[in-house]
């Protein structure tokens, strides 16, 4: 089911700036027992992205009601929410554009995540590197061509996910997940002020770790540093947390961090 500006429909205007330029943002949430997991965090993410992209929106209460409406009818699955700047404007100009368009859809939960939680995921180093742009770093904007290319290369391997570097060689994230690795009692995750997406589950894990016996550090790290870890995990709002059993030729056997985070992230509300 799709809702576009509150109406059940599946077509979007060809002149909408989402289709013209990828001019907008989105978030993907897990539906558990008819409720949107971490609803307020997803709404805040969209608000922050719209502010960064200078998209004027005044429909946040209405949007949350629509999110709850679709979740109640899906029960368990995935909710995707997109916001575009709407129609209008000449060329790249945003003058006389809007109002903003909101697009909601639901889908089944990805079944392979259950298998990966039990077996652990394998990562392959992606040949595609992320561009660095502090104006867009952190937000989940609609321009995802880098991820499309990363996924296309990943599908030519036997790995489950891609480990992605930025254009300067810093470990950044995965194709559709964030990354953590543990060395002793210190947990590291890449800084995302120049590239990458600051995922909802990444934020949640950082808050959990800050209240634990672990020390959590956001770092700039090269691949060799990350590969010296005792343990590695990936996370996103749907997984929510999955242990990594191998990255290329490097294997990880410890699941200490995963066993701590997994039950806390499964029902985060």
What role is predicted for each listed range?
Residues 78-83:
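ATP-grasp fold ATP-binding core
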Residues 1-68, 73, 84, 89, ...:
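Helix-start/capping segments and mature chain N-termini
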């Amino acid at each position: 089911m799709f809702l576009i500006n509150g109406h059940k429909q599946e077509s979007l205007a060809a002149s909408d700036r989402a289709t013209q330029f990828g001019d907008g943002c989105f978030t993907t949430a897990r539906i558990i027992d008819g409720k949107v997991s971490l609803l307020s965090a997803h709404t805040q993410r969209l608000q922050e992205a719209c502010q960064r992209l200078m998209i004027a929106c005044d429909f946040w209460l209405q949007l949350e009601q629509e999110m709850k409406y679709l979740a109640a009818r899906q029960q368990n699955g995935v909710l995707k929410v997109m916001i575009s700047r709407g129609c209008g404007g000449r060329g790249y100009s945003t003058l006389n554009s809007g109002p903003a368009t909101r697009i909601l859809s639901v889908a089944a939960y990805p079944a392979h995540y259950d298998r990966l939680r039990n077996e652990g995921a394998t990562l392959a180093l992606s040949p595609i590197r992320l561009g660095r742009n502090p104006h867009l770093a952190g937000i989940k904007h609609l321009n995802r061509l880098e991820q499309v290319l990363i996924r296309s290369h990943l599908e030519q391997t036997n790995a489950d996910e891609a480990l992605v570097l930025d254009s300067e060689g810093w470990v950044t994230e995965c194709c559709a997940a964030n990354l953590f690795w543990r060395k002793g009692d210190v947990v590291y995750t890449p800084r995302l002020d120049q590239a990458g997406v600051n995922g909802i589950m990444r934020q949640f894990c950082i808050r959990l770790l800050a209240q634990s016996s672990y020390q959590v550090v956001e770092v700039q790290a090269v691949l060799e540093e990350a590969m010296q870890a005792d343990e590695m995990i990936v996370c996103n709002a749907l997984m929510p947390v999955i242990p990594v059993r191998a990255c290329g030729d490097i294997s990880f056997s410890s699941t200490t961090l995963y066993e701590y985070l997994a039950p806390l992230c499964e029902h985060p509300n």
